[in-house]
Amino acid sequence: AEGWKGCYALGSSYIALPWWAGMATFGQLTPDVMVLTVLYSIAGLGIAIVNDFKSIEGDRALGLQSLPVAFGVEKAKWITVGTIDATQLFVAFYLRGIGEDFYSNVLFCLIAPQIFAQFKFFLPDPIKNDVKYQAAAQPFLVFGLLATGLAWGHHVNMLAA
């Protein structure tokens, strides 16, 4: 994806739009849900950047300004992990703030192996290890999305009771 907009568009199409459609159909699409999913879409932006590392030569040849081309590999790899980690940490603290401590703790536990995989695979060589990193880390991010959805469902049910 080219630049910030392309990566964010990709991340939001995978995360925010399906969640919003589901909430609009089966629940209630509230500002809180929109904020949580926009945050996870920023994590999705980071995931989209991971895919750009393997295309650096082609992007340069075609004049595409993917983040690794625009910022260089060193800066782009830190932008990548920063967006993925910071947004999930913010969501975990948000869940704690609304009283969903159990789910917040679950999310913290799911973030830890992602950070481990970042230091083991991605940060040393994002071009060579992108697939290893995604295989090791992505399932934990997806389970984090699930935990956040369950937390929100629990929170809404507790408010309704």
Where would I find each of the regions flagged by the language model?
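Multi-pass alpha-helical membrane architecture of UbiA-family
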Residues: 1-161
